[in-house]
């Protein structure tokens, strides 16, 4: 005859198998959903300074400041399998020293139950926009893109890029002002 521990082990193993199958079923129902939505980005102000970079050699580096607006309706992304979204605004540009530079300028976490409609006006960069040299001065093609990671309850962590981006030129001169 089977002991109590043997029966408990069988019940636990069966329950674990059923839970794994249900979790996989939950994942597969939303795995192929398109999570891209239109995004409107508008840059209202760009300022460029040449400052000492205290993180590396004692050379002067470009420091950019951007004021921007974001408009997006993220409601269609949220379903029963989405726990939260990690949004981030990144700048992508090339210089003579580096073919590709990518810098995260701003981020935000949108939880399930929060307002999924973004109407952000006159936002400033959350993180410093340093270039490792003088590659921002006069750069005519700095592209800002809003992207997000979908954090699901079950399944993979997809990286999605919004269907709107904006390319902005940086000024040819440095600002002398003390504040932003």
Curated annotation (Swiss-Prot):
Pfam families with a match to the protein in the record: SPC22 (PF04573)
This chain is glycosylated at 141
Membrane topology classification: Single-pass type II membrane protein
The alphabetized UniProt keywords are: Endoplasmic reticulum, Glycoprotein, Membrane, Signal-anchor, Transmembrane, Transmembrane helix
Q: Where is the signal peptide?
A: none
The compartments listed are: Endoplasmic reticulum membrane
What does UniProt give as GO cellular component? endoplasmic reticulum; endoplasmic reticulum membrane; signal peptidase complex
Q: Where are the transmembrane segments?
A: 12-32
- Residue intervals on the Lumenal side: 33-180
Cytoplasmic side: which ranges?
1-11
BP term (GO), one? protein targeting to ER
Q: Which InterPro entries match?
A: SPC3 (IPR007653)
**Protein family (similarity comment):** Belongs to the SPCS3 family.
* Self-association and partners: Component of the signal peptidase complex paralog A (SPC-A) composed of a catalytic subunit SEC11A and three accessory subunits SPCS1, SPCS2 and SPCS3. Component of the signal peptidase complex paralog C (SPC-C) composed of a catalytic subunit SEC11C and three accessory subunits SPCS1, SPCS2 and SPCS3. Within the complex, interacts with SEC11A or SEC11C and SPCS1. The complex induces a local thinning of the ER membrane which is used to measure the length of the signal peptide (SP) h-region of protein substrates.
Q: Per its database record, what is this protein's job?
A: Essential component of the signal peptidase complex (SPC) which catalyzes the cleavage of N-terminal signal sequences from nascent proteins as they are translocated into the lumen of the endoplasmic reticulum. Essential for the SPC catalytic activity, possibly by stabilizing and positioning the active center of the complex close to the lumenal surface. (Microbial infection) Plays an important role in virion production of flaviviruses such as West Nile virus, Japanese enchephalitis virus, Dengue virus type 2 and Yellow Fever virus.
Give the matching PANTHER family: MICROSOMAL SIGNAL PEPTIDASE 23 KD SUBUNIT SPC22/23 (PTHR12804), SIGNAL PEPTIDASE COMPLEX SUBUNIT 3 (PTHR12804:SF0)
- According to UniProt, the name of this protein is Signal peptidase complex subunit 3
Q: Which organism is it from?
A: Homo sapiens
